[in-house]
């Protein structure tokens, strides 16, 4: 028995069909019913119902490094946009390293709407009110004070990193700090603002040409040309 129709938009947790049905795609079995794991569209292929993930939606996993924007200040933490199917939740206890009296200290003292954070995904539980829990209690995480955030399609993140980190190491030849979030947000911080603009353009080029052979060498050549132009004062 099916609970969906062709081209229907489904969200994580939505019931797709009963266990005796043929279902494919990112789904899970719960009490005799298939439920969707992702935001996707339903397709019927002969006698099989298929959930097709919508490209660009980040699918969080425990341990992922993500870059998010604070979208709301709650009573005991913050709501954070991580480009997923639902906002993530950053509890006070996972953000601060000391006790805070919430009755006398407003949370906006630490993080406010619009702030950018680099965080780790601590847990993912689709049965919770906030399925995605974040933490700042890890290395290389915390509030981002400056720099540039570039957004790409999450599925292109491995290309920006490259095999054994080859592409990322190439990008870092400019001497900038770069943090790649698994949710498709990339933070870049350089001493020279022009370098940030240049790196942002390279990252978008990698996204657009991820299928091209020899892309790492081409990006390295562009960086060398850029360095030469800076030395000559033509940038």
From Swiss-Prot:
<dbReference type="InterPro" id="IPR054371">
    <property type="entry name" value="RRP4_N"/>
</dbReference>
<dbReference type="GO" id="GO:0005737">
    <property type="term" value="C:cytoplasm"/>
</dbReference>
<keyword id="KW-0963">Cytoplasm</keyword>
<dbReference type="InterPro" id="IPR048565">
    <property type="entry name" value="RRP4_S1"/>
</dbReference>
<dbReference type="GO" id="GO:0000467">
    <property type="term" value="P:exonucleolytic trimming to generate mature 3'-end of 5.8S rRNA from tricistronic rRNA transcript (SSU-rRNA, 5.8S rRNA, LSU-rRNA)"/>
</dbReference>
<dbReference type="GO" id="GO:0034475">
    <property type="term" value="P:U4 snRNA 3'-end processing"/>
</dbReference>
<dbReference type="InterPro" id="IPR003029">
    <property type="entry name" value="S1_domain"/>
</dbReference>
<dbReference type="GO" id="GO:0071051">
    <property type="term" value="P:poly(A)-dependent snoRNA 3'-end processing"/>
</dbReference>
<dbReference type="Pfam" id="PF22625">
    <property type="entry name" value="ECR1_N_2"/>
</dbReference>
<dbReference type="InterPro" id="IPR036612">
    <property type="entry name" value="KH_dom_type_1_sf"/>
</dbReference>
<protein>
    <recommendedName>
        <fullName>Exosome complex component Rrp4</fullName>
    </recommendedName>
</protein>
<dbReference type="InterPro" id="IPR026699">
    <property type="entry name" value="Exosome_RNA_bind1/RRP40/RRP4"/>
</dbReference>
<dbReference type="Pfam" id="PF21266">
    <property type="entry name" value="RRP4_S1"/>
</dbReference>
<dbReference type="InterPro" id="IPR004088">
    <property type="entry name" value="KH_dom_type_1"/>
</dbReference>
<dbReference type="InterPro" id="IPR012340">
    <property type="entry name" value="NA-bd_OB-fold"/>
</dbReference>
<keyword id="KW-0271">Exosome</keyword>
<comment type="function">
    <text>Non-catalytic component of the exosome, which is a complex involved in RNA degradation. Increases the RNA binding and the efficiency of RNA degradation. Confers strong poly(A) specificity to the exosome.</text>
</comment>
<dbReference type="Pfam" id="PF15985">
    <property type="entry name" value="KH_6"/>
</dbReference>
<dbReference type="GO" id="GO:0000178">
    <property type="term" value="C:exosome (RNase complex)"/>
</dbReference>
<dbReference type="GO" id="GO:0071034">
    <property type="term" value="P:CUT catabolic process"/>
</dbReference>
<keyword id="KW-0694">RNA-binding</keyword>
<feature type="domain" description="S1 motif">
    <location>
        <begin position="63"/>
        <end position="137"/>
    </location>
</feature>
<comment type="subunit">
    <text>Component of the archaeal exosome complex. Forms a trimer of Rrp4 and/or Csl4 subunits. The trimer associates with a hexameric ring-like arrangement composed of 3 Rrp41-Rrp42 heterodimers.</text>
</comment>
<dbReference type="InterPro" id="IPR023474">
    <property type="entry name" value="Rrp4"/>
</dbReference>
<comment type="similarity">
    <text>Belongs to the RRP4 family.</text>
</comment>
<dbReference type="GO" id="GO:0003723">
    <property type="term" value="F:RNA binding"/>
</dbReference>
<dbReference type="GO" id="GO:0008143">
    <property type="term" value="F:poly(A) binding"/>
</dbReference>
<dbReference type="GO" id="GO:0006401">
    <property type="term" value="P:RNA catabolic process"/>
</dbReference>
<feature type="domain" description="KH">
    <location>
        <begin position="147"/>
        <end position="203"/>
    </location>
</feature>
């Amino acid at each position: 028995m099916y609970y969906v129709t062709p081209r229907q938009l489904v969200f994580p947790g939505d019931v797709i069909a009963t266990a005796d049905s043929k279902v494919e795609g990112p789904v899970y079995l719960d009490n005799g019913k298939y439920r969707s794991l992702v935001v996707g569209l339903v397709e019927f292929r002969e006698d099989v119902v298929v959930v097709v993930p919508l490209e660009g939606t980040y699918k969080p996993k425990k341990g992922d490094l993500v870059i998010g924007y604070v979208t709301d200040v709650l009573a005991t933490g913050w709501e954070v946009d991580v480009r997923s199917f639902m906002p993530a939740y950053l509890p006070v206890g996972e953000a601060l390293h000391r006790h805070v009296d919430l009755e006398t200290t407003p949370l906006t003292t630490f993080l406010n709407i619009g702030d950018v954070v680099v965080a780790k995904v601590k847990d993912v539980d689709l049965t919770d009110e906030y399925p995605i829990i974040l933490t700042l209690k890890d290395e290389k995480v915390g509030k981002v004070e400056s720099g540039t955030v570039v957004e790409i399609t999450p599925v292109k993140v491995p290309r920006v990193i490259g095999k054994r980190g080859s592409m990322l190491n190439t990008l870092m030849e400019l001497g900038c700090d770069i943090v790649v979030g698994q949710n498709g947000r990339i933070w870049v911080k350089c001493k020279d603002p022009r370098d940030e603009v240049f790196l942002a353009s390279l990252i978008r080029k990698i996204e657009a040409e991820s299928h091209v052979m020899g892309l790492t060498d081409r990006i390295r050549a562009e960086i060398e040309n850029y360095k030469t132009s800076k030395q000559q004062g033509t940038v």
